[in-house]
Curated annotation (Swiss-Prot):
Compartment(s) where it occurs, according to its Swiss-Prot or TrEMBL record: Cytoplasm
Family as reported in the entry's similarity comment: Belongs to the EF-Ts family.
NCBIfam families, per database record: tsf
Lineage of source species: Bacteria, Bacillati, Actinomycetota, Actinomycetes, Propionibacteriales
Region described as Involved in Mg(2+) ion dislocation from EF-Tu: spans on this chain: 75-78
Role description: Associates with the EF-Tu.GDP complex and induces the exchange of GDP to GTP. It remains bound to the aminoacyl-tRNA.EF-Tu.GTP complex up to the GTP hydrolysis stage on the ribosome.
Main location (coarse class): cytoplasm
Source species: Cutibacterium acnes (strain DSM 16379 / KPA171202) (Propionibacterium acnes)
Keyword Cytoplasm listed: yes
Protein name as catalogued: Elongation factor Ts
Alphabetical list of PROSITE patterns matching this protein: EF_TS_1 (PS01126)
Length: 270
């Protein structure tokens, strides 16, 4: 099958592989993106198990109470529009009042004038002339703490983190929000990683070890080590704490008397 330049670019952006390596992997995978990523990982042309850090810079996140919303736009020109920013805060407040814990629930939430969030976004898109949509929404019923991060001072917040927790050490809770914003964990703990994902990582790690010529008798040990690295990168509680990299996030939270129940991280462009 013919491989397009756009497909090659997408794979290069996601893996950091060279153009010819990316094209060869896509050809071998018959255009299957995920399979091509694995081929590059096994061959050593891509670094292991990382989502692309390249994110579109458009849209914003907004929060109210125990709710966090992510609203997407096509350009950062719109993201800086005062009417767009005001609408985002109005939408966050409506989502919080409704206890909307999903995108669909937030779109159906009522605004003060009786219209819905979905209606508001449709009207705003028509007025501005650009696609605007609610990309995601979350609401926590327990103790919640929110952190909003600006990638650029001339733009509204584009990364939002919300955690649900037990404990009284707000400084520690805020610190873990900074950790989530900076390190983009995918899961809270390794217990939450789906079994098929773990098995996939085991398979890829074994293939990489064999490609490197490692003796078969030590491959299981190598796989366990690389799987530990995967958990350390992708599971929040296993990550080294940015406040003290000699401790894990789990250790710093335990010392602070804080239990983290769950978290969400929204980022403009994701």
């Amino acid at each position: 099958m013919a491989i397009t330049a756009a497909e090659v670019k997408k794979l290069r952006d996601a893996t950091g592989a060279g153009m010819m390596d990316a094209k060869k992997a896509l050809t071998e995978a018959d255009g299957d993106f995920d399979k091509a990523v694995d081929i590059l990982r096994v061959s050593g042309a891509a670094k292991a198990a990382k989502r692309s850090d390249r994110e579109a810079s458009n849209g914003l996140v907004a929060a109210a109470g125990s709710s966090l919303v992510h609203i997407g736009s096509e350009t950062d020109f719109v993201a800086k529009n005062e009417e767009f920013i005001a609408a985002a805060h109005e939408i966050a407040e409506a989502a919080d009042k409704a206890g909307a814990d999903s995108k669909d629930a937030a779109n159906a939430a009522a605004l003060a004038d009786g219209t819905t969030v979905g209606d508001k976004l449709g009207e705003l898109a028509a007025k501005i002339g650009e696609k605007i949509e609610l990309a995601n929404a979350a609401h926590f019923d327990g103790n919640a703490h929110v952190y909003l991060h600006r990638r650029s001072q001339d733009l509204p917040p584009q990364v939002g983190v919300m955690v649900e927790y037990e404990g009284d050490n707000i400084e520690a809770v805020h610190g873990v929000c900074l950790q989530i914003a900076a390190m983009s964990p995918r899961w809270l703990s390794r217990d939450e990683v789906p079994a098929d994902v773990v098995e996939h990582e085991r398979t890829v790690a074994a293939d990489i070890a064999r490609e490197e010529g490692k003796p078969e008798k030590i491959i299981d040990r190598i796989v366990e080590g690389r799987l530990g690295g995967f958990f350390k990168e992708n599971c929040l509680l296993d990550q080294p704490a940015i406040s003290d990299d000699k401790k894990t996030v789990a250790q710093t939270l335990e010392a602070a008397g804080v239990t983290l129940k769950r978290f969400v991280r929204f980022s403009a462009g994701e």
